[in-house]
Structures are given as C-alpha cells and as structure tokens.
Amino acid sequence: MITSMISYPSLTTTSPIFDAGIPSTDKNMLGEQIGELKGKTMGQRVLDSEGPRMETTLSSTGSVRGTNVKETVTFVGSPISAGVLHGEGHGVLMGGESEMATFRGEAFGRISSSGSVKWRGAHFYRTTSSTGKLAFLNNVVGVFEAEIDAEGNVTEKIWEWK
C-alpha cells in the first residue's frame, strides 16, 4: 500500500486514503508540454450587443513537438460573470509537410486590470493523416493557457492531457 505524509505545524500522520494504491504515474493527468506559440489578434467583430458576444480571430506561429506550425483560431467569447468570459471556437494548425490538424476548443478567460485576458481551456484535436509530424495529435486533448494582452499580442502553451 502506498501512503502519503500529511504535515501540519504540530501534527504528522500517514494516511492511505490519498493514494489508495494508485500508481504515481496515473495521478498526474497533465502530460508533457507539446506546444508553444506567439501571435496577434487579427480581427474582432460584435455578434450581439445584448450579451455581448464578440468573435475574435488569432494568428500565431510556434512549435508543436518540435515542428514549426502556424495556428489560426476563431472563437466567440461572452461574459458569464464580472471579469470572466466563456469562449468556444475552432482552429487549424498547419505545419510539417503540408500537414494540417483541426481542433475545437472551449475555455474560461479572466480579465485583468491591465486589460489582458488570461484563458484556460482545452483543445480537442483531429487529423486526417496517420503519418507525419502532426499525426500524433489525432484524438488528443490538449489543455492550454493563453494570454491576449491589451495590444492584441497572444502567447499560448499547450500540454497533452493524458
């Protein structure tokens, strides 16, 4: 049985409840970082002022598992509470030997006092190729964090979700 140590200022105890015999490799759902991209907001438009709902298109370049890629994403964001946005969108990654991977994504964004929005969410990838440098993305879920600053600059990091 695997046990964990819980440490408090005046108390130390061992408890099998936390690990329950689960191998440590199965407890970590966040896999390796598979991508890092930087780019720019290309355009925005208001879809509905009674929400409001805004459509945003981003264009980024970077690397996905060592392959240079270009990413284009269009998403719709709308406020769900004070300072919090919900976004849903679609994207395309192009790289390698004319390879392409598509994805659907969903995220929550938090608006900072500086005007930037920090997004946390997931991409659900699909490819039609079984070979090539982006083929590994087929049916992969990638969790991401992205930031769009007040000037429209975008940074994004993606990890595989095991």
Each PLM stretch: what is its role?
Residues Y8-K162:
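Beta-strand-enriched cores of mature, soluble protein domains
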